[in-house]
Each structure stands twice: as structure tokens, then as C-alpha cells.
Amino acid sequence: MSLGLVGRKVGMTRIFTDDGDSIPVTVVEVGDNRVTQIKTDETDGYTAVQVTFGSRRASRVTKPLAGHLAKAGVEAGEVIKEFRIDAAKAAELQAGSSLSVDLFQVGQKIDVQGVSIGKGYAGTIKRHHFASGRATHGNSRSHNVPGSIGMAQDPGRVFPGKRMTGHLGDATRTVQNLEIAKIDAERKLLLVKGAIPGSKGGKVIVTPAVKAKA
């Protein structure tokens, strides 16, 4: 895994190219990423960098976490995230340092992970895009039913994984191979082409794309 940044989804807007084309973009604030710990093979069994983002009141921080952050000399954040990196990259970082938008560049392909917007309990039409039944012509009280969910006495059960009604959204999702359309280094903003998971103000994780095409 590559080194990335933790950010906050600000919202969506659009920008224009020199040719006048409109590009929908999502604004992601990625400032104030602070390194809290460097993990190594010798001490932890693997190599990674631990990062915190945002701020949190001291009264909301547990004593073990407060001691952990004090050792690195950083302020408590809302999120703590680890990025698996190689030993060479870990040697360039140190606890207490900051990460900024210069990790990325315009045109780079990235993956963005976030928690999708919760929709509550949903039917199969909204949740799985099932077709609805006929409105008339002999159909009564079966307009939005999912249909058959299995056989009869044999096997006598509904197979696991059957697409049915249930809770929709509020799940961790990753959108891959998005493109960085613009970077505002002064305000520490990434403008990502297209939509990303989550609601406004939601926390997201931005990393270089793992399936980027050369």
C-alpha cells in the first residue's frame, strides 16, 4: 500500500477547462495530516506510518491515546489511520512531521475510500435495482414484491447472499481510478473528478490508485 492522506469531503462543484468544458469535481480538504508513529519490522512486525487528521477536545481523548500522541508531540485528531509503506519511505518520515498535498499531482489516478450515505431500510427496487411488477393487467398487490426467493421443501431454506430487502448504505466503499483535476496547495484542497462516497463533512482516505493504467 502507498502513502496517502486522510481528508474531509467538502462538497461538489464544477470547474471549466480552457476549452470551456464543464468538469464535475468533489472538493476534498486534506490539510493537517500529522504523523503519530512510524512502525517498523523490528518493533511491530511490519512497516507503516500512522497518521491523524482533524482535531478533538482533550476531554474526549483517552489517557492511553493521549500518552501515545504526546510521545509524538502532536495534537489529538478525529481519525487515526495507518498506511503500509516500504522501509525506504518510512526512513524519510518521522513522528511529529506533517503530510501535505504535495504527495499528489494533477492528473494522477487515485482511490478514495469513505462511508456511503445511509438510506435506511430499503426495498429490492431501490437496493438492488429490481424491476417492478406490472401496474395492471391482472396484477394486484404484487407491484413491488421481489418475487421468488427460493424453492420449496428441497432445499427448504433461503440461500445466503440472496438479494432481498434490508439496510442500504452506511458502508465503507472505495471508488477507484479517479483523477485529480486540480490542486489548491494554499488551501490544501484536492479537486477530484467525479463523485466520491459519503456525505458532506465525511472523512475519506485518499491513496494512489492500485489499478492505475500506465
From Swiss-Prot:
Checking Gene3D superfamilies in the record gives:
3.30.160.810, Translation factors
GO molecular function annotations of the record: rRNA binding; structural constituent of ribosome
PTM annotation (N5-methylglutamine): residues:
Q153
Q: Which cysteines are joined by disulfide bonds?
A: none
Which GO cellular component term is one of those annotated? cytosolic large ribosomal subunit
Q: Does the entry feature the keyword Protein transport, yes or no?
A: no
Keyword flag rRNA-binding: yes
**Superkingdom of origin organism:** Bacteria
Q: Where would one find the signal peptide in this protein?
A: none
Cite a single GO BP annotation: translation
For region Disordered, the annotated ranges are 133-153
Which key words tag this protein in UniProt?
Methylation, Ribonucleoprotein, Ribosomal protein, RNA-binding, rRNA-binding
User: What's noted about post-translational modification?
Assistant: Methylated by PrmB.
What's a Pfam family in this record? Ribosomal_L3
Under the heading InterPro entries, the entry gives: Ribosomal_uL3, Ribosomal_uL3_bac/org-type, Ribosomal_uL3_CS, Transl_B-barrel_sf
The record describes the protein's role as:
One of the primary rRNA binding proteins, it binds directly near the 3'-end of the 23S rRNA, where it nucleates assembly of the 50S subunit.
Q: Which HAMAP family match?
A: Ribosomal_uL3_B (MF_01325_B)
Q: Which NCBIfam families match?
A: L3_bact
**Subunit structure, briefly?**
Part of the 50S ribosomal subunit. Forms a cluster with proteins L14 and L19.
The similarity annotation says:
Belongs to the universal ribosomal protein uL3 family.
Q: What is this protein called?
A: Large ribosomal subunit protein uL3
Organism, as annotated:
Cupriavidus metallidurans (strain ATCC 43123 / DSM 2839 / NBRC 102507 / CH34) (Ralstonia metallidurans)
Q: What is the lineage of its organism?
A: Bacteria, Pseudomonadati, Pseudomonadota, Betaproteobacteria, Burkholderiales
